[in-house]
């Protein structure tokens, strides 16, 4: 029997490894920029064309490489960062596995130009799909320049699953932000299709944060700095009043490396307990400095998950540091015993009333309220013996009235699509309003109760309104008939560049809803018009919320983005729990609900109505 196990060619092995390391153009930029920082670069330029699908170029002024190192750098597991296993626990560099360049070269066409200081000529190396196509001496500046073209050219399936240019650019900006926030001493530029997106000089950390997210964020931040024998924790946390449901900037860094850490995130949010509304988040930029021997970086392909040896102790230190910062800046509620602000109430002067005698009351000292015999005779009188005849008379009087309800009162079977689609909503298909009463009742400002043939229908008024508005906005987008209401004084909304890319992707759908936005440059937009019917809502918060929701959902397809926008706007414009409705308003809401195609559930799957049948109601009173 012949042997069937064989070694894979290096090119195939590199493509397999690239599947973990290089997932999208943003992954290429992350690896190349981190290599530049490890090489001691003080200035890094990133140039991107078509969101990295066509080309990516990273230029640095670092140490550069010799001819031999340039050739060896594209071999798997070739690295200058470590030499033995013990070095994994003393890492001070971003890279160490020796996989990044080999993985990039396996799925793209790469050109490297590099020169070390003191060398007259540098080296140019050309590689395509792991195959070296050329190497020669060239004149070039000190440092390295990597040009990556046609990413995934030899893996069509991977290239097909890349997202739109706007989404991929947003991913690039996210990775770029993570790198520049942890390296404020390095200057960076980022260009996309020839346009400059970022130009960040080397500055202090606070100025770097402002350079990335805008000057407005400076007013939201409180500085934090705690140094212990175990860990140093520094950075900034947001003021409680700046909390938001979506779009909070939340970053953890350890030893100059970005990481995700849900456990430490909980420590921060616990410190804000009772300071921010439930479900809202605050921004934070937290930097840990820990002995490399006490953390394990090598547990995730992208190195974004890090294990700490003293995780629980650091959790306590972090939580205490945040609480101390909030207390130091008076950002926590306190009990104020200061009497300076109390009103000046004059003391009562009784001298003018000294001659007044108090009234005297006489009473019988022999009176005993517990003596039954002393109680006055009861004035209770028995009801008339003819009370049955009295009620019988009222009954005859009521039956003699010729009462007929309004024939135009709401009937669910006329508005519901259940008749047109038998079996679509089995539990409400016979739930038309009986007795044609046209009368609805509101319970605790949240539920609408109405009588139906099968029993009692209970409707969540907010969810019903969301269902109605969602269908309305989806129809407006599909028909491109959104009605815009002009603003007398346009609002200005500011977005970081990573969110601008998402905004551009959904801009057309926003216009169909009725929003009118003008690009002012630098991530600023003027809101000149908003959809009619959303009076009282903050347009800035509304647009930011839609952008953040689109970012979370990924905006995979156009229809999904349209649904996200319609649902976000519907939730914002719907009536709130506790809002008192007139009977006419409740009737209109019920009519509108059963005029939509799917009245039973909200677009995100929450129950809108429930019916308690007549038998269950009768059982309650047996």
UniProtKB/Swiss-Prot annotation:
Any GO BP: mismatch repair
Gene Ontology MF annotations: ATP binding; ATP hydrolysis activity; ATP-dependent DNA damage sensor activity; mismatched DNA binding
SUPFAM superfamilies: ATPase domain of HSP90 chaperone/DNA topoisomerase II/histidine kinase (SSF55874), DNA mismatch repair protein MutL (SSF118116), Ribosomal protein S5 domain 2-like (SSF54211)
Biased composition (Basic and acidic residues): 399-414
CDD domains, alphabetized: HATPase_MutL-MLH-PMS-like, MutL_Trans
Gene3D superfamilies: 3.30.230.10, Histidine kinase-like ATPase, C-terminal domain (3.30.565.10), MutL, C-terminal domain, dimerisation subdomain (3.30.1540.20), MutL, C-terminal domain, regulatory subdomain (3.30.1370.100)
InterPro entries: DNA_mismatch_repair_CS, DNA_mismatch_repair_MutL, DNA_mismatch_S5_2-like, HATPase_C_sf, MutL/Mlh/PMS, MutL/Mlh/Pms-like, MutL_C, MutL_C_dimsub
Any GO CC annotation of this UniProt entry: mismatch repair complex
Region (Disordered): 399-422
Pfam families with a match to the protein in the record: DNA_mis_repair (PF01119), HATPase_c_3 (PF13589), MutL_C (PF08676)
SMART domains xref list: DNA_mis_repair, MutL_C
Described purpose of this protein according to its UniProt entry: This protein is involved in the repair of mismatches in DNA. It is required for dam-dependent methyl-directed DNA mismatch repair. May act as a 'molecular matchmaker', a protein that promotes the formation of a stable complex between two or more DNA-binding proteins in an ATP-dependent manner without itself being part of a final effector complex.
UniProt record similarity statement: Belongs to the DNA mismatch repair MutL/HexB family.
Protein name: DNA mismatch repair protein MutL
Name of the gene this protein is made from: mutL
């Amino acid at each position: 029997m012949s042997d069937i196990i064989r070694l894979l060619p290096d090119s195939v092995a590199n493509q397999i490894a690239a599947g973990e390391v290089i997932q999208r153009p943003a992954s290429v930029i992350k690896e190349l920029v981190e290599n530049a920082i490890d090489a001691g670069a003080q200035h890094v330029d990133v140039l991107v064309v078509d969101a990295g699908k066509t080309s990516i170029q990273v230029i640095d002024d670092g140490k550069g490489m010799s001819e031999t190192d340039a050739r060896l750098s594209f071999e798997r597991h070739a690295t200058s960062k470590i030499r033995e296993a013990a070095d994994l626990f003393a890492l001070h560099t971003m890279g160490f596995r020796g996989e990044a360049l080999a993985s990039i070269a396996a799925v793209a066409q790469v050109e490297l130009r590099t020169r070390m200081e003191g060398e007259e000529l540098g080296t140019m190396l050309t590689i395509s799909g792991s195959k070296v196509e050329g190497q020669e001496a060239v004149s070039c500046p000190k440092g390295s320049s990597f040009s990556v073209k046609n990413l995934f050219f030899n893996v069509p399936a991977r290239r097909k699953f890349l997202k739109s240019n706007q989404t991929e650019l947003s991913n690039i900006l996210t990775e770029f932000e993570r790198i520049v926030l942890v390296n404020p001493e390095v200057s960076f530029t980022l260009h996309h299709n020839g346009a400059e997106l970022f130009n960040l000089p080397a500055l202090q950390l606070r100025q770097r944060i402002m350079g990335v997210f805008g000057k407005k964020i400076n007013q939201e931040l409180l500085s934090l700095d705690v140094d212990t024998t175990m860990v140093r924790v520094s950075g900034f946390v947001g003021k409680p009043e700046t909390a938001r449901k979506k779009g909070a900037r939340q970053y953890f860094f350890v030893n100059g490396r970005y990481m995700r850490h849900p456990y430490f995130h909980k420590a921060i949010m616990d410190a804000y307990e009772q300071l921010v509304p439930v479900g809202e988040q605050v921004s934070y930029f937290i930097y840990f400095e820990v002995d490399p021997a006490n953390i394990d970086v090598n547990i995730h392909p992208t190195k974004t998950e890090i294990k700490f040896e003293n995780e629980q102790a650091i959790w306590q230190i972090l939580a205490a540091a945040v609480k101390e910062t909030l207390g130091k800046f008076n950002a926590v509620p306190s009990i104020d015993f200061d009497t300076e602000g109390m009103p000046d109430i004059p003391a009562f002067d009784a001298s003018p009333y000294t001659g007044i005698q108090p009234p005297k009351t006489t009473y019988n000292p022999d009176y005993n309220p517990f003596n039954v015999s002393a109680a006055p005779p009861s004035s209770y009188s028995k009801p008339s013996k003819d009370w049955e005849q009295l009620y019988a008379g009222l009954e005859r009087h009521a039956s003699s009235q010729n009462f007929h309800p309004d024939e135009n009162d709401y009937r669910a079977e006329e508005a519901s699509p259940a008749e047109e689609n038998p079996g679509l909503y089995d539990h409400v298909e016979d739930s038309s309003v009986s007795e044609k009463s046209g009368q609805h009742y509101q319970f605790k400002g949240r539920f609408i109760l109405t009588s139906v043939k099968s029993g009692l229908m209970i409707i969540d008024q907010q969810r019903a309104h969301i269902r109605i508005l969602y269908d309305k906005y989806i129809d407006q987008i599909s028909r491109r008939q959104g009605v815009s209401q002009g603003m007398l004084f346009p609002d200005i909304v500011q977005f970081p560049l990573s969110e601008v890319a998402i905004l551009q992707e959904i801009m057309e759908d926003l216009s169909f809803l009725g929003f009118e936005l003008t690009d002012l440059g630098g991530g600023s937009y003027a809101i000149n018009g908003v959809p009619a019917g959303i009076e009282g809502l903050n347009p800035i918060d509304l647009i930011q919320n839609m952008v953040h929701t689109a970012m979370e959902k990924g905006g995979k397809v156009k229809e999904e983005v349209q649904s996200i926008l319609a649902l976000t706007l519907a939730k914002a414009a719907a009536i709130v729990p506790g809002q008192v409705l007139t009977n006419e308003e409740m009737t209109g809401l019920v009519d509108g609900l059963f005029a939509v195609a799917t009245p039973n559930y909200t677009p995100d799957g929450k129950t809108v109505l429930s019916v308690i049948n007549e038998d269950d109601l009768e059982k309650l009173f047996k």
